[in-house]
Design a protein with these regions (language model features):
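Tandem repeat scaffolds
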Residues: 1-105
Length: 105
């Protein structure tokens, strides 16, 4: 990345990582649970076995990211625009819709 850092297999729970660019990076096994990711750029990134559960995603960008193997936690409909064009799995789609009160059959 711009900082020349690698975060693979890293525990970054509750870390303050505002406005860092992870654009086009492949992040593997990174736990961002509860992290402050305000303004971070994950566009076109691949998140494999990563967790975003409970992270602050205000102004974060995920357009065209591959999130199929990431734990997204409970996303809100208001967050949906941040994920435009991102790839998610059928399971994740069902979880998102279920969180909105819809029954996925």
């Amino acid at each position: 990345g711009a900082l020349g850092l690698s975060f693979s297999r890293s525990l970054l729970r509750d870390a303050r990582l505002r406005r860092i660019s992870f654009r086009r990076h492949h992040l593997e096994g990174v736990d961002f649970s509860g992290a402050d990711l305000v303004g971070c750029d994950f566009r076109e990134a691949v998140l494999t076995e990563c967790s975003l559960r409970g992270a602050n995603l205000t102004d974060a960008r995920f357009e065209d990211a591959d999130l199929r193997e990431a734990d997204l936690g409970a996303l809100k409909l208001a967050d949906a625009s941040r994920f435009r064009g991102a790839a998610i799995s059928r399971r994740q789609a069902a979880e998102l819709l279920s969180g909105l009160g819809l029954k996925v059959m």
